[in-house]
A protein has these predicted regions:
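Conserved alpha-helix/loop element of class I SAM-dependent methyltransferases that forms part
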Residues: 4-20
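Core SAM-dependent methyltransferase catalytic element
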Residues: 167-207, 216, 220
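Conserved class I S-adenosyl-L-methionine
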Residues: 21-30
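A short glycine-rich, Lys/Arg-flanked "PGG" loop and its adjoining helix->strand segment in the class I
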Residues: 103-115
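Juxtamembrane boundary at the C-terminal end of a transmembrane helix
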Residues: 225-231
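A conserved beta-strand element that flanks and buttresses the S-adenosyl-L-methionine
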Residues: 89
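Class I SAM-dependent methyltransferase SAM/SAH-binding core
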Residues: 30-76
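C-terminal alpha-helical "lid/dimerization" subdomain adjacent to the S-adenosyl-L-methionine
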Residues: 121-159, 163-178
Length: 231
């Protein structure tokens, strides 16, 4: 997903927390646009969508992009060595994933990160005082799990990660939460933690579905009318 006008804020966010030479995984790298935030020698983009990986490799040939399997069980593994990376970058990713799967991913991230490594993340978030943005995000975004900062934080804590909030960027109807997460050896695991879809999502889902698929229905209808007039 792409949110307009977030570019400068993202460059500033990463520029303050990444140094050349640190090994980076861009998890859910999409079409590769965020690769430019990092040095090609430091970067691996991981993505489940084969066509997006192919497009990324065409657009950014100096960078490394790989197709990865879905993580659905505790036995599934990402194709990355233990304790091998300094940073895992998550940009507009987690809100597409239910909390059960997020927790499985966090365990994998814990395995992959070096000691002292960190997760740098950007996610749309619900802010109680920002009702208009909360509605707009859920109307136009395909992600079903836009939750609050507190819920994101609790989800990370349930897998022994501490959260350091960095900033909230407000742009084009979105509240984009920037944060850093680090593993805490003193933390505890809560296997029973989970989050649900918010009421915002439940009420706006029909509108979102119409906006996502309605244009194709309209296009088919227009083509049908044109063909009917031609023949």
């Amino acid at each position: 997903m792409f949110v307009p006008r977030q570019g400068k804020h993202t460059f500033d966010f990463i520029g303050n927390l990444y140094s050349k030479g640190e090994k980076v995984i861009d998890f859910g790298s999409g079409i590769g646009t965020n690769s430019r935030l990092f040095s090609p020698d430091d970067y691996i983009g991981l993505e489940i969508n084969k066509s997006r990986v192919a497009e990324s490799n065409r657009s950014f040939p100096d960078y490394n992009f790989q197709v990865i399997p879905l993580i659905n069980t505790e036995n599934d593994r990402l194709p990355v060595k233990d304790n091998s990376h300094d940073i895992i970058f998550l940009s507009l990713c987690l809100h597409h994933i239910d909390s059960k799967t997020c927790k499985l991913l966090f365990r994998e991230f814990r395995r992959i990160l070096k000691k002292g490594g960190r997760i740098l993340g950007i996610e749309p978030c619900i802010i109680p005082t920002s009702i208009f943005s909360n509605i707009i995000m859920n109307v136009i975004d395909r992600g079903d799990y836009i939750i609050s900062e507190e819920d994101y934080t609790d989800m990370y804590k349930s897998e022994s990660f501490n959260i350091d909030p960095i900033n909230v960027v407000r742009t084009f109807g979105y509240n984009l939460w920037q944060y850093k997460a680090t593993f805490s050896e003193k933390g505890s695991i809560n296997k029973n933690f989970f989050t649900k879809k918010t009421l915002y999502r439940k009420f706006t889902k029909p509108i979102n579905t119409f906006l996502t698929y309605g244009k194709w229905v309209a296009l088919i209808f227009i083509i049908f009318l044109l063909l009917q007039n031609l023949f």
